[in-house]
């Protein structure tokens, strides 16, 4: 760790959908920051058979908004701009730059293992294809978790999601449910998109 350093982080947020953020330093959640952005953490994963055909056809990630406190270093969070084309500028003086590492948040159901992994690397879609989990997802520019195509990539300072069926699992999941995972704010409706409009994930 490097102690007593000045850090500046800048990132453009093109729309008002949720995206992931993963930083190696702590960020105070101030009123000024909340004037322009919303932050959240993952709380749970849910799946449902909405048409009663014996097959899971909807998977959701539940998140909870952060109203105060601190975003901890090396911990995956979610960020949403309150207006389009907003620039996130974080300036932290005399702070600690923590050693970068991948942090994994495990959020499993009875039959499925989910993992949210923070990354500082630029990971190509072809690299995900060779990893051990069943499926990998990143948040698209339109705000939902989508499977990462081989011709796309994950940018640094973000998180990805993996999903693996447990051995002996009787669960059947539809192709549509496996293709995308919605993000739902606790107590509110779902967010997501009907189809991929851009292979680039942010």
Residue ranges of each PLM-predicted region?
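Acidic, divalent-cation-chelating loop motifs in proteins
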Residues: 49
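Contiguous mid-protein beta-loop-alpha structural module that forms a pocket-lining wall or clamp
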Residues: 37-41, 57, 77
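A short, polar beta-strand/turn micro-motif
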Residues: 1-35, 64-135, 139-144, 149-196
